[in-house]
Swiss-Prot record:
One of its GO terms (cellular component) is nucleoplasm. It comes from Homo sapiens (Human). This is Hypoxia-inducible lipid droplet-associated protein. It is found in: Lipid droplet; Secreted; Membrane. Residues 35-51 have a biased composition (Polar residues). InterPro entries: Hipoxia_HILPDA. GO terms for biological process: autocrine signaling; cellular response to hypoxia; positive regulation of cell population proliferation; positive regulation of cytokine production; positive regulation of lipid storage. The modification Phosphoserine is found at residue 44.
């Protein structure tokens, strides 16, 4: 009987933890809503602009 109670309490704790994580993620999304996806767009923009900036600087390619 004790093992069943421990498993039940473990399930309750994991459920509450998952709910807490989802609430924190939604709050983070609401805080970033004025500029949605800023961290991801800046990372992708940096990844896209770094190679294009580097290519024209090579003298062999400009000749």
């Amino acid at each position: 009987m004790k093992h069943v109670l421990n498993l039940y309490l473990l399930g309750v704790v994991l459920t509450l933890l998952s709910i807490f994580v989802r609430v924190m993620e939604s709050l983070e999304g609401l805080l970033e809503s004025p500029s949605p996806g800023t961290s991801w767009t800046t990372r992708s923009q940096l990844a896209n602009t770094e190679p294009t900036k580097g290519l024209p600087d090579h003298p062999s390619r400009s000749m």
